[in-house]
Structures are given as C-alpha cells and as structure tokens.
C-alpha cells in the first residue's frame, strides 16, 4: 500500500494537472484513508468503507486525468468506463459487473509485469542458453563455439542474425460469442478448449534481438507462480482497485422525464450492489468490491447529482466541483506540467532537427484564443489547446524533413497569422477548431 501523505499526493498531481485543488485534495484523502485502514485491527478494518467521489465539471478540465494519475501513483489497478455503455440486466449489452471483470484482467497484467521483473535475471540466463542452442551449428568443438557465440551475443554483434523459433499460435475468442455482454462466456469456452486440446505451435523466423525478448518472456512466464499471481492480483483489486465511471450524468434524468428512462434507472440500480459491496464472479474466482474506490464524473449540464436515484447518491458521499478553465489556466497548462503540450511538440520536431521556441506572448495568444473559442462554441476545456496547436504547427510538421537545422519562433504574430481568419468567422471556428 502506498504510503504517500495527502500533501505529497497533491504535489505529484500538480506536476500534471493545473488547478482543481478541491478535487486533488479529496482524492488524496481517499487514497490516504486506504493506507490508514490497513493500519487498523482486523475487525474494525473490514467495517471502514471507501468514501466514493462524484466529480462535477465540464469536459476537458481534468476529471479523468486526476483519477488516471492517481492510479499510476499508487500502482493500483485502474479502469475507466463510460456509464452509457452498460445496459440493465436482461437487455442486450454489457452488464455493470463486467467492469469488475475487466479490472481484474488489468490487475493480472499489472502484477504479471511486476512478478516477471522479479524473475527477469533468472529468465535471461535461461533464455540465453536457449538462444545459443538455436544459433549453435552442429559439429565439433561445440563448447568452444558456444562460448564464442555467447561473447558475440553479449556484445550485440548477433542482433541482426535470424533464427528459427517455435512460437505458440495466438487463438482468437470464439467469434460467434463476440457480441456485447457475451465476452465472459467466450473467454471461458476458449480456456476450456485450450485445456482439452494441445496448443499449436509453428516455426517462425526472427531476428536474434526479437527472439531474445520472446524467449525471456516465455521463461518469465514459466518461472512466475500463476496461483500466487492470481492471489496477488485479486488482493490488489479488492484493496486498491479504482473504477472511474465517466458520464454518470447521462444516467440521471430530471423528474419530469424519469418515466421514459426506465433503462437508465435500471443501470443505476444494477450499480448499487457493486458500489455498496458485493461479490462478482470472474474466471479468477469471486472478487469482493467492498473496498474498491469508485470515482464517478459528469458535466451535469442537463441534470444534477440529485437527479440520480437516492440510493446511488448515498453511495457517493463526496462531491468535488471542478472549475471551468480560462486563459490563465491554459497558459499554465502550456508552461508548467512536466508533459506540457509545448514540450511534446518541441521533442517531436527535434527528432527532425527542427527547433521550436515558444515565446511568452505567443503562448498567451494561444491561451486567449482557446478561451474565446470555448466561449463562442462548445466548451471542451483544455482539449481545445490540442486543436489550436495542431492548426498553427501543421505547416512545419509537414515540412520538417526538409527544414533540418532550422529554428521556428512561435510568437504572437505567428499565432495570429494562422488564426485571424478563424477568429473573424465564428461559423468557421465551429468546424475547424
């Protein structure tokens, strides 16, 4: 369990997300409470439930990013789902329990990577021996030749040589069951058939570098204890899992329209036992959801949280309102985060030998323009910056291979030259930006 304090969590989130202090503090406390729960005596520990959160705010203000960065920070299994993709039990489509099954698959992959890393050193030794067996010609002085090949391989001189290697055929899930809501049955049948019938293999030519990684992966899988892996993954889901339910507002309906939205209300009622705490059946066994943290999010333009059914409102006791972003926040987004868009474009074009320099007045003009377009058309928050940056850098991105060694200064004048026609024509900005 991660032992970061709430203040340390907020500091880490500040590296990637601008503003939204209330939401950051709320999720930081929720994560710290998990660590606090682990310190309690067993009887009391089981009684402490997570405080689920509803984030309220327009699109592009950081709701999803806060949850995603939080999960990475805690090395927790994380899944983002859209509430509108689920249907009430009895209708064609995915039922809400599938989000827990998907979360378990994510946890399995997460723990498998960690366990494979622990045995990688041993796996590399075994993979090297198998690779030398493939490279070694039949003849005399095999030991001496083997050591020469080992030396050449470790020095990287053999990476482009090709070898024939046996690889397992990748089987696809049974096609007839590849319809929404039937994936679980398809996967179970696939697993059953794989146990009955032997896995087919075929010979494939690979470069030594690719064969090396393939063999290391095979040996790692053999060394990892799958029963232990499943137990660790299940515990990780039950104790640290985070489910982010986006567009929860689309399930809410104002009281005057409630009679026509029976299916939406049905999905809300199906969510109740999972959020409250129940056992979901997966191919890895039962997963208890009692201590999984659920974070719901929505813009709530046409509805409000109180339009959700009362029982579901009670399962999300914490509310965080995220503020709409203006030009000041856009400027900070372009300059402060470690992964700022400006740094991304600088790095991308530097691979072609083109240097981009963003001036302060250029960045302020981009920020002001993003605010104007969001005000006049749809407010899509920080995502507007992506479309504007693509527009003003489209020419240099196209011509970069012929511009090796040049420097481009993105000034206010440069930005205006690309955007003034769009600014003057509101209808044009609706289509282009």
Swiss-Prot record:
Transmembrane segments: none annotated. ATP binds at residues 18, 60-65, 246, 311, 383. One of its GO terms (molecular function) is ATP hydrolysis activity. The keyword Cytoplasm applies. Signal peptide: none annotated. GO terms for cellular component: HslUV protease complex. Its main location: cytoplasm. CDD domains: RecA-like_HslU. It is found in: Cytoplasm. InterPro entries: AAA+_ATPase, ATP-dep_Clp_protease_ClpX, ATPase_AAA_core, Clp_ATPase_C, HslU, P-loop_NTPase. Keywords: ATP-binding, Chaperone, Cytoplasm, Nucleotide-binding. ATPase subunit of a proteasome-like degradation complex; this subunit has chaperone activity. The binding of ATP and its subsequent hydrolysis by HslU are essential for unfolding of protein substrates subsequently hydrolyzed by HslV. HslU recognizes the N-terminal part of its protein substrates and unfolds these before they are guided to HslV for hydrolysis. Belongs to the ClpX chaperone family. HslU subfamily. A double ring-shaped homohexamer of HslV is capped on each side by a ring-shaped HslU homohexamer. The assembly of the HslU/HslV complex is dependent on binding of ATP. This is ATP-dependent protease ATPase subunit HslU. The gene is hslU.
